[in-house]
């Protein structure tokens, strides 16, 4: 399946993303939004920025913030996904209009769910994510990083050679955490259905902007109603983004081919042993 076609491209401030979500509710474009929030420890009350859960919003005032860079980088906690939450907690948008933020793999799952009448695609406003993939078990992996105070992290970004953090003093810190193995060989880095998509690919971590792409007439209508500054994407940033996306896809295709070649060399017993392992 091909990625969804793009009508227009903008830069918006990451901090303005909640306004976009609020506008969907205020203008009656959707009845509910499947948003996201960082989990809070029941013991300490501390926010865990590495563990993100879906959350259902019905009123604009419920949306105070949104963990954009967290969701792009970590995805939802392992047992959650946008498509699963939509089906289980929002009745598959069968009788209400629902907005949700979906990774490329979520958009494929939505199509499959619609085939068995578990999701009504016509009632969805989909905000897709263009991404490299996501990192797993970051909180656990960072325990060995003695010189990194995780309470100082204000933003995160997956790079070519690890996970980069922006700290509250403006400094950055990179650690050797790569995307999940399955993500590294996935060649679907863009949503195949979406009204809007967002991406941080090609944008430096210090930059306050994210890329926003419009894919539908409903999304164009939303942009007109936003009341925030949405600048057409400059040609240099557009080229950097597109070049990096092409580079990421090429690397994924090469990894996929290499892994398939190695898989075909395995015996039946070895293949069964590999399938029994958890790869995510």
Role assignments for model-derived ranges:
Residues 1-261, 268-271:
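Iron-sulfur-associated redox domains of electron-transfer enzymes in respiratory
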Residues 270-280:
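An accessory alpha-helical subdomain
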């Amino acid at each position: 399946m091909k990625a969804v076609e793009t009508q227009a491209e903008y830069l918006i401030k990451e901090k303005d993303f909640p306004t976009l979500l609020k506008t969907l509710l205020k203008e009656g474009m959707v009845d509910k939004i499947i948003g996201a929030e960082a989990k809070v420890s029941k013991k300490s009350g501390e926010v865990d920025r590495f563990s993100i859960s879906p959350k259902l919003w019905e009123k604009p005032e419920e949306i105070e913030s949104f963990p954009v860079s967290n969701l792009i980088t970590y995805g939802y906690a392992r047992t959650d996904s946008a498509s699963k939450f939509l089906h289980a907690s929002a009745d598959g948008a069968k009788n209400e209009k629902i907005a949700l933020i979906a990774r490329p793999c979520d958009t494929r799952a939505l199509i499959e769910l619609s085939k068995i009448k578990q999701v009504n695609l016509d009632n969805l406003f989909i905000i897709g994510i263009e991404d490299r993939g996501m990192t797993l078990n970051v909180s656990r992996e960072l325990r060995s990083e003695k010189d990194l105070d995780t309470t100082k992290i204000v933003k995160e970004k997956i790079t070519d050679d690890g996970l980069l953090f922006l700290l509250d003093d403006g400094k950055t810190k990179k650690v050797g955490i790569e995307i999940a193995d399955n993500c590294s060989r996935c060649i679907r880095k863009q949503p195949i259905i979406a009204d809007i998509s967002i991406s941080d690919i090609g944008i430096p971590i210090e930059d306050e902007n994210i890329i926003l792409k419009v894919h539908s007439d409903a999304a164009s209508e939303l942009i007109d109603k936003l009341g925030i500054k949405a600048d057409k994407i400059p040609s240099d940033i557009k080229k950097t983004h597109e070049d990096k996306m092409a580079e990421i896809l090429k690397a994924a295709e090469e990894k996929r081919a290499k892994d398939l070649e190695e898989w075909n060399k395995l015996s039946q017993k070895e293949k069964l042993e590999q399938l029994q392992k958890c790869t995510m």
